Amino acid sequence: MESTADGDKARGEEPVAEGEASDIRRGDGEFPAPEDEHPDDGEPDEPADRDDRSGESDADSGYYSADGGRDAECDGEAARPDTPTDESSAPTTPSTAVRRSSGESSPDRGGCFSHSSDSELGCATETRDPFAAGLRKCIERQAMILTGALKDAHVDPPLDSMPLTVDAVQRQLERFLFNPDPKVPREHVELATTFMPPFMTPKAIANYHIFCGNRPIPPSCKANRSGSEVLRAAENARFFKRLPRWKQGVTVDDGLGDEVSPITELKDAKLVPLRDDTSRLEWAKMRGEHVRYFCYPSLHMPPKISRMLMEVLLQPFAQEVASGPDQEDPEPVYPTAELACIVDPEGVMQPHGLARAIEVDGHGSAGRPLYRSARAYGSVFREPSSIKKAQEVLHHTFHHGFVALIRETAKVNLSNYATFHGITYNDPLNNCMLAKLMEGSDKRDYVVDSIYLFLVLTWQTAMGMWQQAIQEETIEAYREAFTRLRRAIYALETPTEISKAIVDVLMDGDRLCAEMPKLPNFTNGSQISAFRQFIMERSNIPTTAAPFLPSDFVPLSFRQAQPLLWDQVYLLQTAFFLCNHGGYLWEPEETENPNPRDRTYCPCNLCSPHRMPQHNVPLHNELLAINTFEIRTDDGKTFKLTPELWANAYLDKFEPKDYHPFEVVHFPQHEEAFSRDLTACVTKSPEILSLIRQIQASREEFLLTRGKGVYKDPDTGEVLTPQPDLQAGAARRQALPTAYADHARGAATSAEPSRALRPTSVATAAGNRTRGCSSARYRLGPTLRRRSNSSWPREWST
C-alpha cells in the first residue's frame, strides 16, 4: 500500500516517489482500519480499500488487463468513512492515469486527492489507489509492444502508405508478436514477446501422430534378465547383426525362464525381484509392484501407408463398406479357394498339406506388418552412412570424443545445438554431462536407454516426414502397384521374402535410404530426457518413486518376445551395438595423477586414431600451433591458424577406409586394422609446422640473447634473460643458467609422472574449458622463454 505525502510529513519523513510508495508500510504491514469496520478481534488488520475478494492474484501481480483492472468491482463499492463527497469520488480512467503521469493533480479511484509535492526525487503525483500503478504499467507495456510493432512494420503495402486502421495495426501487432523477424538471432529476441509456458511439453508438430501404444509387460523384459546370459551377450555385442529370418514353427517364450533366480514368489508380478538386480532395479521393483502395462513408443509405418496395405493385401475396413440391414462383413482380398490356387497352382498337394499351407500363409499374413516394420529399420539403420551419422549425433549428445576436444580448443559447446527439419536451434540450458556423472551399470543402463530413445525418435521423425509429404496421387500409385503384384507376393514361400518384397516396393529400392542421410537430427540430452519423462508419464510410472527406464520393459531376444514387440527388440539390440561401437563407456585407468587429455579421449573409429592427438602426432603439433603464427604473402593476404578455422577442418576430418561400421574395432586393441597415414587437419604437410617452429625458436633466441630489457616467465615470474653481476668492480661475465633440463622451464625432470595441470573431475571439466593438449609450457606464442639445447619438447620429436 502507498503512503500519502501528508502522512509522511506527520511522521517527519520525506514524501516518496510513486514507485517507492508501494513498498512503504506501517510496522504491522498495513494501514489502520476504522473501528466500526474492523473491530479488534486479534486478527491482522486489513487494508481499508480491500474487500472480501482481495485475495485474487491480480492484487499482487502488478499486471492488469487493458480495461484498468477491476473497475466494475471497485465502482460498485460502498462509500467508506474517509471518502470525500466532492468530485474526487470520480472513478479512475485511463485519461486520469495519464494526467497523473504528466504531473497533474487528479482524484484517484478511492476518492482521495493526490497531493503534488516538489520533492528532491522528482515525484509529481502521489496516490493511494493500488490499481493506478498497475494500470500505468499495463499501458506502458502495451505502448512499448505497439511501438515496436509499428517500427517493425514490413507489410505489403507499407503501413505508412495505407490508412491507419484498426485491422492494419492488429495484423502488424500479431506479426510482430508471433512471427518475429527471422534475421534477428533467436538469443536476441525480446523475451517479453515469448509466450511459451515454461517447461511445458510442446505438442508434436510435423511429427508422427501415433506416439505409443499400451501393452502388457512381458516377464522376459530387460528388467527381469539381471545376471542372465542373454543380457551379458547384449552388453558385449560386437557386431551389427542382421534381422533374423522368420522360420515357421519357432516357439516364442516370453516367460521369466530358468536363467534368473527370483528372491520372492512370482504371484502376479510382472517385474520380479532377482538376486542379481542392481540397486536401481531393486528400488524400482519394490516401488513398482503395481506396474502391469507400459506405453511402448509407436514404430509403425505412416498411417496412410498402413491403411493402404491393409486394404489391398488383407481386406477392406468395415466402415468403408456400404451399410445395410443385410450387409455382411467385408471379404478378404483372396478367399480360401483362390488362396489354394495361389499356394498350389499345379494342384498336386494333398488336402491335409494344402490346408496346412493355407494356415501357415494366413499366419504369415498376420505377422507380416510387424516383420515388415523391422525389415524397414534394418534397411535404413544398417546403411554405413546412417551408422556414421548416428554416431556423430550421439557424440554430440553425450559430449564425447571429438566434440569434447572442440570445446577444449575452440571454446564452443556443440552439444547444445539441435536440428529439426533443416533448422538449427541453440539450447544453452542443455546439460550434456549427465552420462559422465555415473559409472558402472548405472552408466551403461542410462547410455543404452538414451540411444534406444534416440533411435525411436529418429524413426518417428522419419515416419512423420513421410506421413506429411505423401500425396493422394502417390497413395493411388502404391495401390495400383500392390494390386498388380498382390498375387506374386502371396505366392512367395516365406514371410521373410514377402516382407522384403513389400518393403522394396514401398521404399522404391533405396529411395528412403537416400533420404536418410538428412537424418538423424542432432539431438541434445535435454530432448532425450524430456522424451523419456514423457513416455514414463504416459505409462503412469513416476520416476521419482520408481526409477525405471523405458528400455527396462523391452525384451532382449526375438525368441523371448511376442511379435508385437519385435520392432522394440530390434532397436534395443541396435542400441547395445551402438553403445559399444561408439566407446561411450570407456573410462581411463585410475591413477594418482590423471591425464587431462583423458577427458576428451574416445577409442571409436570416428575419433581414434585420426582425431585423437594422443595417437596422431601431426594433429598434436597443429593443436600447439593454433594462434601462434601469421603468414603474409606478397599480395598482402594473411593466413592465421585460428581455433575456428581449425575446428571447421577438424569436423570434416574422416578416413572412410579406416572406418568399420558393422563391427566394434577400437584402435588401442586393433592397431593393425588401420592403414591410413596420420595427418593434421589444416596443414597437411609436416614441413610447414617444422618451419614455423624453427622461425619461432630463432625469434625467441634472438630476443633472449640480444634483446634489451628483462624477460620473465608469464606463469612463474622467473627471469629468463641472463643478468650481469651488479657488484662494483666485478668483471662482466655471463650469468650461470638456471637449472633447466629437457623441459622448457622448471627444475630437472623428476622420475615421478607429472601431476595434472588442472583438476580433472567431471565438474571441473564442464566448468573449466581449457585448451586440449596445450600445456602452458608447450605453447608457442608471444610469451618468451629460454629453452635448453633441445629447442622443442620431446612430444614433437616422437
Curated annotation (Swiss-Prot):
Comp. bias regions, Acidic residues: 33-49
Keyword presence, ATP-binding: no
Biased composition (Polar residues): 86-105, 789-798
Region ranges (Disordered): 1-123, 740-798
UniProt entry keywords in alphabetical sequence: Chaperone, Eukaryotic host gene expression shutoff by virus, Eukaryotic host translation shutoff by virus, Host cytoplasm, Host gene expression shutoff by virus, Host-virus interaction, Inhibition of eukaryotic host translation factors by virus, Late protein, Methylation, Phosphoprotein, RNA-binding, Translational shunt, Transport
Modification sites for Phosphotyrosine: 711
Region of interest (Binding to host EIF4G), residue spans: 309-376
Signal peptide limits: none
Molecular function terms from GO: RNA binding
Subcellular localization(s) per the UniProt record: Host cytoplasm
Subunit: Monomer. Interacts with hexon protein; this interaction allows chaperoning and trimerization of hexon proteins. Interacts (via N-terminus) with host initiation factor EIF4G (via C-terminus). Interacts (via RRM domain) with viral mRNAs that contain the tripartite leader; this interaction allows ribosome shunting and expression of viral late mRNAs.
Entry protein name: Shutoff protein
Gene name of this polypeptide: L4
